[in-house]
Each structure stands twice: as structure tokens, then as C-alpha cells.
Amino acid sequence: RELEDVFSGGTYRIVNRNTLVTRIYTDAGIIGEAFGGDEDQTQMEIVSLIRDHFEPLLVGEDARNVERLWDKMFFSNVDLGNRALHVLDLRNRSILMQAIAAVDMALWDALGKYYQVPVYKLLGGYRDRVPVIAIGGYYEAGKGQDALNEEMLYYKELQMAGVKFKVGRVSVAEDIERVARVREVVGDDFVIACDANQAWTPQEAIAFCRAAEPLNIRWIEEPVRWYDQLEGLRMVREQSPIPVVAGQGEISRFGCRDLVIHGQVNILNVDATIAGGITEWRKIAGLAAHFHVEMAHHEEAQVSLHLLAAIPHGLYVEIFPNPKRDPMWFDLPVARPTIRDGFMELPTTPGLGIDLNEDVIAKYRAA
């Protein structure tokens, strides 16, 4: 779905929004459904993998056996072209893990509906509301500091706890000025986390973190470039007065293990819609707890709300309050979770607790 405006972060531009709706039908009459993901380049391949490979693999299985079904998908012999899966083919591996994630999330929704409880209760039920922050501060054409300040005040009016603010597209000095002026406007009780989207060298990231220390920044997210994730993150972590976040691009618990042990991150923001679904995410959360690492989640509030509510070391659920940035969040669910006093409240209905708008699905369906 093409967006009305262009939204730019430290290293990218967003011009469209996509998602994948997955449904599982059981002989008990339960329909497990979930939506997530935003990969326009590979989404059709993900759909084909689910239909052509996972569907015949899973039909007839007990939907309650989520761990067994996850392993069955992960260890199956998948043919995604002219290469085998277990070679250095990151694109195909990513397709596999996103396909597993789509099926796995729908399975958990079915499981919650079967047992008549919300998914977060199945996962541990640590709290019934999670603090919520907006994703904003994008670089947009013609958008000056006044408009940026107004955007942040609008988030406060929406009762957001704070914002994840984009940095990294201009100089460190310019970004510090942007953040400092926003801090003046929103006050000290409004959370500001900064997201560089892998824009900086370690030295630039360290310079930003040191300069931003007086501004009470909750964390710096993905500060270094993709090819320097482990050593670069370690360097920033050791010299930054601000907690360091990474993990949204990792697709398995094994990559997250390396970020924790070698990258020494303070927080993991793994995306369950990319990294194998709920089953894999909860294993990553368990790993993180052993190292006193907190858990965040990259976007996708419809599933992250349940995950973060189920553990003691979960942080903020993230949403795009601007319908121009994420029209799917506003149009696809029939009703969205309530936001009140800086928190998003958990649904009380079984499963993931979000019914989908069939008219929207029909209008934008691509496959």
C-alpha cells in the first residue's frame, strides 16, 4: 500500500506499507489468525513457502504442539531456489524465518482461543498493561523544528509515554540540537529513545551518546552499521552513558546470543514477525534474562503487546500514531487496544485479541 508521504530515517526511506495475514483452520472450528511483517520485496515468496511447503507439512498435526511444529518447519528440507537453505544465503534464511513466524503467530492465536485465554496469559501473564511509545521524529521534506516539536506534543496529547526518535541522517551536532529542543518542549517526564538505524561509525555513535547524556535519553538503538554489529556495538556499549539496543534485524536466537555475549547490548529489540514468531521470541527473552538484558520489540504492537506483557524485563510497545505512516494499524484491526495514561492495555478476549477488517483485506489483497 503506497503511503501519502515519504518517511526517512537514518539510512532508509519508507514509501509503502505491507503486511501478511495468516490464518490456520482447525477441525475444532477455531481459526487462528495473525498479521505482521513489512517486506514488500519478498512477501510473495513468503506466501508461496507457506502455501507450497508448510501447509502440506502441517495439515493433520495437533495445533497445540507449537514447539514440535516450529521444529518441523525449521528443520524441514526447504527448496527456495538454486541453493540449499543451510549455506550462506541470508535472503533465503530471512524468508524462511518470516514464513515460520507467520504460521507460528497464527498457531498461538489458535491456542489462546482453544484455551479461552489471551496469548500473554499463556506466555506468563506478568502484567495487564505495557507502557507505549510512538515511533516518530522522521526526517520529512519541509519539516522544521517547529513541526517536530508539534509532533511530540501531539504524542503527549495521545497519552503516549514517550517517543522513539529518528536520528542519524544529519550530522551528530544537528541531531543533538533536534533532540535537545524536543526535550525542552516535552519536559523530563516524557521518554525519548533515539534510533539511528545503523547510520554511524562507532566513533560517531559514542560522540552522540556522550553529547546526549544530559538529555535523559532512554536508549540508543542500532547505532552502528550492519557490518560492524558485534565489535562496533561492544565499543559503543563500553563507552556510552546511554543503554545500547540492537536485534531487530536478527532472525534467530543464535544471532541474538552473539549480540548479548559479544556485542554486550543492554536491550534486545527482536521482532517476532521476522525472527521465527512467538515461539522463538520467548526463547530469546529467556536468554536475555540470564544476562540481565531487557527486551523491547520492533514495531508490530498486535503481537509485541502480548510478548512484553508476559515477562518481567519487557519494556515499551511501539506504534506509529500517524495513520499516514502505518495505515494498516489503523485500518486492518476492527478495534485497537486502549491507550490510557502512557500504557496500552491488554485485550481480555482469547488469543491475540484482534479481529481483522475483511473489507480492508479484500481491498489490498495481493495473493
Residue ranges of model-derived segments:
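Conserved, mostly hydrophobic/aromatic
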Residues: 29, 54, 103, 116, ...
